C-alpha cells in the first residue's frame, strides 16, 4: 500500500534485468531532455553569439564539473546509505539519514558557493584561457555559480527519490525544466541579445525549479515525513554519510582536475581547436546518458539488495547490466558514426573556412570516443556496483587512475602524433579506471562466498 501511494519501488524481488531497465528508462528520458537542452543551448549560443561565445562556454566545462561534482558526489554517497536502509525496511534510520543529509548538503553548498566565486577568475587565468574569450567565460561562471545551492538541493532531493526506487519524479522535473530552460535560452540569448549571460541565467532558473519540484514530491512520501526529532544528532550518522560521500566527491574532483589539465593543453592550440573540442563535448553527454542511467539504477538495485542480504540477486543484476550496457553502447556508437557530423554542424557557425576546420576537429574527436564507448559503459557498471555495495574507496582510486592516465596521455601523446593525441586522453582514462573497477568488483563479490 505504501509503495503504491508513494510511487517508490522495492528492487529486492522480481526480474533483475527488468527492474534495472524500468528504473533506468525514466532516467534516460530525463538525460535525453537534459542533453537536448544542452544541444539547443549550444546551438543558440553558437549560431546567435558566434564561435567565440561557443568557445567561452567550452573553456569552463571541466571547471564546472569540478564545482558541481562536489554536491553531486556527496548526494550520490548519501543515497547509498538511504537505499540500504530502504532495502532493510529500516524506515527510522532512513528518515534520520535523510535529515542529516539535508543539513550536510546545505552547509557544504554554502562553502562551495563562496569558494567558487572567490577563485573563478584566478583559475581561468591560470588555465591560460584565450584572451578573446576569458571575459565571457568568467561572466558565465559567475552567474552559474550563483545557482550552486539550487543544484545541490536538486541533486539531494533527486538522489533520495532514486534511492527509494522513484526515477519518474526526477524525469518529470527534468522535462519541465528543460522546456523552461530552452524557452528562456531563446528569449534571453536570441531575443534580448544577452549572449552567454542569458544562457547562464536560463540554466539557474530552470535548476531552481527542478529543486523545488522534487522537494514538494519528496514531502508527500509518508515513510520519509521528517520531524524535528529526525534532525537531532544521531550517533555516528554524519560520519557514516561523509564516509560514503567524501570518496565520491574526491573521485569527481580528481576526474575534473584531470579535465582541467587537458583544457590547459587545448587552450594552447587556439580558440578554433577549443570550439571543435567544445562541440564534441556537448555531445559527450548524449554518448554517456544511458551509462549514467544504468549507473543510478545499479547503485539503487545493489544497495537495496545488500540491505536485504540478497547477494545472488546482486550478481544477477550486474550481469544483466553488463549485457544491456554492451548492446546500448554499440547502438549509440553506430549512430554517431552515421549522423555525428550532421549533428555537430548544428553547433557551428561563422566564416566557412573556420567552420570547416572546427567541424573536422570535432568529428575526429567524436569518432575516436564512439569507437571505444563500450569501455565507458563497463566503467559505469562496475563503479556503480561497488558504490551500491558501500565501497566508495575503490571508485575514488579509479578516479585517481583516470587522472593519471588522462594527464599522461594529454601531455605525452601530442609529442608523438601531434594535436590528435589529445583526443586519446579520454580513452586512456576510461581504460585505466575500468581495469581497476573490474578487478575490485570481483574480488569484493568473492568475499561474500
Where are these regions (language model features)?
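Transmembrane alpha-helix boundary and packing residues in multipass membrane permease domains
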Residues: 27, 31, 43, 80, ...
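Short runs within selected transmembrane alpha-helices of multi-pass transporters and secretion channels
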Residues: 75, 143-162, 170-178, 199-212, ...
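Hydrophobic transmembrane alpha-helices of multi-pass small-molecule transporters
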Residues: 66, 181-185, 211-215, 286-289, ...
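N-terminal transmembrane alpha-helices
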Residues: 11-48, 62-77, 81, 106-113, ...
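Short alpha-helical transmembrane segments in multi-pass integral membrane proteins
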Residues: 1-24, 82-147, 191-246, 302-371, ...
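Transmembrane helical elements of multi-pass membrane transporters/channels
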Residues: 22-41, 143, 154, 177, ...
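Small-residue-rich hydrophobic transmembrane alpha-helices
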Residues: 54-114, 151-170, 276-340, 376-398
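Helix-terminus/linker motif at the lipid-water interface of multi-pass membrane proteins
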Residues: 32, 36-55, 124-131, 187-194, ...
